[in-house]
């Protein structure tokens, strides 16, 4: 059964300026990288910038989601916890996360969304995340429309997010270790060297 919901247009923003423009041009929500532990390691945003974006977005009833979507080391968990509390205090609407270890931290009452980096491509995975307390699940970018429909029909009560624009790779998000193996730069730490994008050439059929 298909459950109809109002579609939320969620736009990416690498920084405060891009986020403000996305809101000004009609985005319902914007996602932006946290000061640390985001999948775009080079896109570092200060708490002050995120707070300014939250303030601007809320003037227009738009929402701000912050990505904390890398695999964390054990020694980083306390710092992550402190950062999440700071993000909560400045009014961030939700976090997009990859590492399930975050769910074991002492968290404020802030909604968690399951990142595409979690490799969310089956109904079973979506149900698992919903049962673990995730409010929304970002599906794998590599899914077909038929596969997305199947997941929605199997999990009609779970809000799903899907990418409609952006880069793709020959590997599933969150499951590729080529960059780490070849260059010592882990895609799951926000440092993908884009190696597979460089070598993959589609041949005409």
Predicted stretch roles:
Residues 2-29:
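N-terminal basic/disordered segments at the start of proteins
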Residues 9-12, 30-32, 64-68, 95-97, ...:
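Hydrophobic faces of well-ordered beta-strands that scaffold small-molecule active sites
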Residues 124, 147, 154-198:
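Conserved anion-binding
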Residues 41-51, 98-108, 142-155:
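Active-site-adjacent beta->alpha loops and helix N-cap segments on the catalytic face
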Residues 22, 99, 129, 162:
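Conserved, mostly hydrophobic/aromatic
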Residues 31-49, 68-75:
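Glycine-rich, proline-tolerant flexible connector loops at the mouths of alpha/beta enzymes
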Residues 56, 62-128:
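N-terminal active-site wall of soluble small-molecule enzyme domains
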Residues 197-205:
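Residue-level detector of conserved catalytic or cofactor/ligand-binding positions
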């Amino acid at each position: 059964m298909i459950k109809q919901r109002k579609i939320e247009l969620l736009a990416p923003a690498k920084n405060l300026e891009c986020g403000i423009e996305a809101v000004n041009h009609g985005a319902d929500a914007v996602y932006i990288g946290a000061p640390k532990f985001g999948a775009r390691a080079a896109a570092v945003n200060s708490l002050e910038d995120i707070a300014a974006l939250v303030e601007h977005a809320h003037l227009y009833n738009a929402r701000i989601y912050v990505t904390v979507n890398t695999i964390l080391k054990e020694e980083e968990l306390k710092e992550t916890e402190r950062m999440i509390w700071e993000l909560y205090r400045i009014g961030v609407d939700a976090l997009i996360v990859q590492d399930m270890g975050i769910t074991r931290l002492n968290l404020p009452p802030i909604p968690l969304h399951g990142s595409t980096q979690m490799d969310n491509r089956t109904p079973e995975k979506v149900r698992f995340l919903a049962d673990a307390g995730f409010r929304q699940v970002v599906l794998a970018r590599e899914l077909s429309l038929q596969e997305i429909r199947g997941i929605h029909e199997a999990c009609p009560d779970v809000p799903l997010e899907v990418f409609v624009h952006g880069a793709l790779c020959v590997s599933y998000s969150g499951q590729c270790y080529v960059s780490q193996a070849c260059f010592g730069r882990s895609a799951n730490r926000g440092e993908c060297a884009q190696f597979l994008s460089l070598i993959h050439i589609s041949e005409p059929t």
